[in-house]
Amino acid sequence: MFSSLNSSNFFIYKIKKQKSIKKLISLLAILFISCYAFKSGITIPANETLILGESNTKNYRAEIKNTSNVKIVIKGEKKQTGEYTQRIELPPKGNLRLYVASDEVIRFINDNNASVKISLQLTRGIEGMRYIKN
C-alpha cells in the first residue's frame, strides 16, 4: 500500500509539472507575439504619394528600407496644420529609423517615373493609409 501511494504521488507531480511547462510555453508565445513588429513590403507607384497614419492616435517608430534603385522623399507633417516637421530623402538601398508622434502623418513621396519599393517595419499597427497622385 505504501508503494502505491508513492507511485500515485509521482504521477500527480509529473502531470502538474507538464501543466506548468505548458503554461510557461503559452506565456512565452504571448510575449513573443506582443513584441512582434508589424512588417510589410510596400510598392509606391510612379508619381504617387503614400500617406500613413491619418487615423493613428499613438506614437510609433518606423524602420524603413528603400529596396529600389531610385530615391524616395519622406515627409512628416502635423495633422491639424499641415506644417512639415521632418523631411528626409532616402537614397536607393538606404535605411532609416523614424520616430513619429501621434499628431503626425508620414508622406512617402515618389516623384520618380518608376515605382519605388520599401520595406516598412512598425512598432504597432497604424490606422489610416492611402495613396494620392502627386
Residue ranges and their predicted role:
Residues 64-68, 108-112, 120:
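Asparagine-centered strand-capping/turn motif at beta-strand->loop junctions
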Residues 82-103:
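Intrinsically disordered, low-complexity Pro/Gly/Ser/Thr-rich segments with frequent PxxP/GP/PP motifs
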Residues 112-134:
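C-terminal partner/receptor-binding element of secreted or periplasmic proteins
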Residues 69-85:
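Short, surface-exposed beta-strand/strand-loop-strand elements in extracellular ectodomains
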Residues 98-114:
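Noncatalytic modules at the cell exterior or secretory-pathway interfaces
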Residues 13-25:
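Bacterial N-terminal signal peptides that target proteins for export
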